[in-house]
Amino acid sequence: MEGKGVLEGRYEMGRVLGHGNFGRVHAARDVRTGRAVAMKVVSKDKVERAGMAEQIKREIAVMKMVSHPSVVELHEVMATRTKVYLALELVRGGELFDRIARHGRVGEGVARRYFRQLVSAVDFCHGRGVYHRDLKPENLLLDEAGNLKVADFGLSALACHARPDGLLHTACGTPAYVAPEVLAGNGYDGAKADLWSCGVILYVLLAGALPFQDDNLVCMYRKMRRGDFCCPPWVTTDARKLIKSLLDPNPGTRITVAGLLETPWFRKTAPVPRPIIADPAAAPVDTRGNAGDDKDEPPEVLNAFHLISLSEGFDLSPLFEHDPAASPGRATARAGGTRFATREAASGVVARLEALAMGGARVAPSLLMVDVKKDGGDAMEYRPFFSEELRPALKDIVWSPAAT
């Protein structure tokens, strides 16, 4: 397959564009449409040996959640026995980092354009409960028209990853761009941490250097905690004020996206770009979990990728795991519950599962995705219960493609 230069009869593989820790990126062409893509080839063996399988799966799921003009698009995911292939939007202009390294700081008008696109993408991600956590010029790409695209969601987190205190606790990111509260180890708000990183990026755009620089990391972190930086004289007063409000070491008083959008520097001249939603499936989701607020709303209509992500038969686990017992059309056991598709009416499913927590999402008018979770008890006891009692009781309502 790969020896012929064509992947799955669908993508013609071209030259290598770059290498990463777990594989390489090729230029490729979709032979069905002629579209040029960047094909990220990930070695399963390297990923598994590094213990990074969950991170790769999370990156894939997150990228399909955040369809936005200023986010690199993930077109398709494929897998073989040894590799995972990610067909990504090909962004030909290279990294923002390289542009600054070659040409130095940018003018205020160009900086404003890049920054607006960055904030639009970040705000959209936050609206869907996604926090990037590694925003930096190396992860910002430029297309041929000079538009900015956010890339590399490998360290991203979802709102559901927060602990009971509502905060994230995993310290990650790039030292020069990470917020001081992330390093403190007491938990942090992912949205506020991303905005700090946006502040560092804005400073780099306008100054051509980092705001906090020191050969000693401890000294650099000390400067960050104090907010100890100064802007070069060519940075305008309005830009200085915005940078200062973004690089506020106190996350409680740090400017929010809503406040940022109203600042004079951000609003100057051109209209503020707002997140663009391409289709209903990409609409922002309220992550606050107020179940009582949507009792009259219809179930969410899922697109094909959401179906793949939710269905136990078609989830992302097979990218790195092989379970011979799992196949489309069978409900399969997991430590916390099970998922299956069914054509049974919702009332019929509820009647069979009234002793368990049940959640459904409409995939099509006649097809439901059912998520069954155990209320408590030991996971080891759940598996025999599932195999011997629950699965047989559900076998006539679990849908499979062959049943259509």
Swiss-Prot record:
What cofactor is needed? Mn(2+)
Residues in a coiled coil are none
- What residues form the catalytic site here? D134 (proton acceptor)
Q: Which Gene3D superfamilies match?
A: Kinase associated domain 1, KA1, Transferase(Phosphotransferase) domain 1
Q: What's an example Gene Ontology biological process for this entry?
A: signal transduction
The family database entries (SUPFAM superfamilies) matched by this protein are listed as: Protein kinase-like (PK-like)
Which parts of this chain are annotated as the region PPI? 335-356
> Could you tell me which residues belong to the region Activation loop?
152-181
Is Metal-binding found in the keyword set?
Answer: no
The function of this protein is: CIPK serine-threonine protein kinases interact with CBL proteins. Binding of a CBL protein to the regulatory NAF domain of CIPK protein lead to the activation of the kinase in a calcium-dependent manner.
Family statement drawn from the similarity comment of this UniProt entry: Belongs to the protein kinase superfamily. CAMK Ser/Thr protein kinase family. SNF1 subfamily.
What's this protein's name?
A: Putative CBL-interacting protein kinase 27
Q: Which organism is it from?
A: Oryza sativa subsp. japonica
The gene from which this protein is expressed is CIPK27
